[in-house]
Amino acid sequence: MRICLVLEGCYPYVHGGVSTWMHQYITVMKEHEFVLWVIGAHACDRGKFVYELPDNVVEVHEVFLDDALKLKEHGNQKGQLHRINRFSEEETKSLRELMECSHPDWEVLFHLYHDRKMNPMSFLKSEQFLNILTESCLEKYPYIAFADAFHTMRSMLLPVLYLLGSEVPLADTYHAISTGYGGLLACLGGYVYRRPVLLTEHGIYTREREEEIIRAKWVIPSFKKQWISFFYMLSEAIYKRAFRVTSLFTNAMLTQIQIGCDAEKCRVIENGINYDRLSQIPLKEEDGWVDIGAVVRLAPIKDIKTMIYAFYELSSRMENVRLHILGGVDIVQYMRKLDFTILTSISEGQPLSVLESFAARRPCVTTDVGCCRELLNGKEGDDFGCAGYCVPPMYRDGLAAAMEKMCESRRRRIRMGKSGQARTKAYYRHERMISEYRKLYREVEEAYGRDWI
């Protein structure tokens, strides 16, 4: 089977949990060919991969959102305007609903911008666009400067309309690794070639964007609700079109259903790691120090600032502690030097760094995000025991107290480490995860036939 993986802002451009997962996934699935359809922010990153692509990656198609800013109106502007002025009632309705971030008919928009090659700039400079925007502003933003609404709407719509005109790589199935822009491209692929669409979410993309927008200073406060609705609208598109939607843990699946995904489509497939590679790492010998590790990429969502503040507080109470912030290293070599690990993210899915730490018999202190609490304490029916401490995000004092408690007793660390290792061995092995995805692809074959490329 030729599978088009639709990726946004991760593999193969940057290291990180999702990128590591993706690289291992492709490498093991040797029986399939993979096409990478990747969305990046900046065209200057074209071809700058930090991974050596496996042999079964047969094509890479790169799309960069800043290329949308280079769009110009077609030379045949009169023809474009003629088509805009003759939008059907169905097309006008879908464009209005797109601008209102409600429930547009995406097939109508795919036909308009992909099949008929409507130029996004022609529409965004048209009288039709201004009329729809004016009506919306009078209804929703009567006291907001029209210029603010105009530029907000253009910046919101331009990337989407640009992506709808993308050249679509041919594949047997389109497997998106997030909702958002990536999910929309997967829907476009399914539309163009009438092929099935799959979705795997490592986190809940919509909720992550919502958190970012709430904190963002670049978004005009009056339009934050509109931006949040925009990303919910994109999620709805792939939730409706996807044949199956997978998540990493039960609460994430329940969130998908709450947002609007059909429960019948949803399935939990937990992350998996190379357990055997990590389980043989010996515990660090006692040397008078307690060494704490953070295996993390430097990104705002990882909240390294709180980690450093919390460690400063800890070091004022205990003199024999050291913090190692690691990224892009051979985890096997560094894990030998650590007594336990920490994770301070403000948002996560099912962090591989925690599972890797458990496999090596190192307990963890984490923030209460994603399924971290489930990893530490176990899900229903799991009696392996506690494997660490969980504290609220951005809670500096709580994090310092949890680290101090972990530092106080080597015996406790060993006991918790054994619990984490047993849990990982039972539920989070890479072989088990791959088996579930192979089963998923077989379901696609059975549902859609085997008329593959």
Which stretches of residues belong to each language-model region?
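A conserved nucleotide-sugar
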Residues: 34, 304, 308-329, 333
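Membrane-proximal helix-turn-helix segments that form the acceptor-binding/catalytic region
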Residues: 160-170, 192, 204-205, 222-245
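Aromatic "clamp/platform" in nucleotide-sugar-dependent glycosyltransferases that forms part
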Residues: 346
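Conserved donor-binding/catalytic core segment of Leloir-type glycosyltransferases
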Residues: 277-278, 282-302, 307-311
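Carbohydrate-associated surface elements
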Residues: 251, 272
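A short, well-ordered alpha-helix in the C-terminal region of glycosyltransferases
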Residues: 190, 398, 405, 412-427, ...
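Short hydrophobic beta-strand element within catalytic cores of glycosyltransferases
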Residues: 363-366, 370-377
